[in-house]
Design a protein with these regions (language model features):
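Core catalytic alpha/beta fold that binds nucleotide/phospho-ligands
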Residues: 1-115
Length: 115
């Protein structure tokens, strides 16, 4: 089992460039975040989830666009198990990945557990 965690200030994501958004977030992630008035809080929480995922994978150099954060119909977040994620899980002899996100007005945090 491996665990990663991250926390960031939401304010850092208020005025990010379009270049940054396209380099870090998938189209699905951007569509989700910008449904909300406080999109920057959701962007920050997804950033934290991506950072926590990288840390759980022992700081492997997984491009952020290869780590897609989504959610179930009832709002439970998850990491999409694409080919990159499945390959990294297999290399570690693990099979599943779970995340939990939280945010307030000031901070967002996420934890990732792979097992």
């Amino acid at each position: 089992m491996e665990i990663g965690i991250d926390i960031e200030q939401n304010e850092r994501f208020k005025d990010v460039s379009e270049h940054f958004l396209k380099r870090v977030y998938t189209k699905n992630e951007l569509a989700y975040a910008f449904k909300f008035k406080n999109a920057y809080e959701h962007l920050c929480a997804m950033w934290c989830a991506k950072e926590a995922t990288v840390k759980a994978f022992s700081n492997l150099k997984i491009p952020f666009l290869e780590i897609e954060i989504s959610s179930t119909a009832d709002g439970k977040p998850f990491v999409v198990k694409n080919d990159t994620i499945l390959s990294e899980l297999t290399k570690l002899g693990l099979s599943d990945i779970k995340i939990s996100l939280s945010h307030s007005k000031e901070y967002s945090t996420a934890i990732c557990m792979i097992y």
